[in-house]
Amino acid sequence: MSSKFIKPGRLVILLNGKYAGRKAVVIKTFDDATASKSRPYGHCLVAGIDKYPRSIVRSMSRKTILKRTAIRSFVKVVNYNHIMPTRYNFEGRDESAFTGLKNTVTVESSQVAKRAHTRLAVKKIFEAKHKAGKSKWFFSKLRF
């Protein structure tokens, strides 16, 4: 698959592996020419949602609302063949959240030793965006 459609900020759906069916944001792309020996194929760095926030109603307690709106995130390097690009982007006109995400998630921070800290930072960015009511499609579970 060409990286013509897969650009940073594009929302994608993962097709294979542990996070199959989960939505993610492309942070950085690596084409065949720039690939290292360990990954001699087109791939990209993505940050996505492992556990989606659930719906809430006004009558729920504050504690229940906090528990139900919690998001679990993941950071992963994925082959282009294992993702499906969507028509959506992470940001519309406001680029601040994606810039924060791009600064937080780097190739070095996606390594196993630093991944836990990176996941927490991504979780905070996603929760802030969810609380603001942006990208409703991204924060809803994919039904299949």
Swiss-Prot record:
One Pfam family named in its UniProt record: Ribosomal_L27e
SMART domains in the cross-refs: KOW
Residue span, KOW domain: 6-43
GO molecular function: structural constituent of ribosome
Keywords: Ribonucleoprotein, Ribosomal protein
PROSITE patterns hit by this protein: RIBOSOMAL_L27E
GO CC annotation terms, alphabetical: cytosolic large ribosomal subunit
GO biological process, one term: translation
Family: Belongs to the eukaryotic ribosomal protein eL27 family.
Protein name: Large ribosomal subunit protein eL27
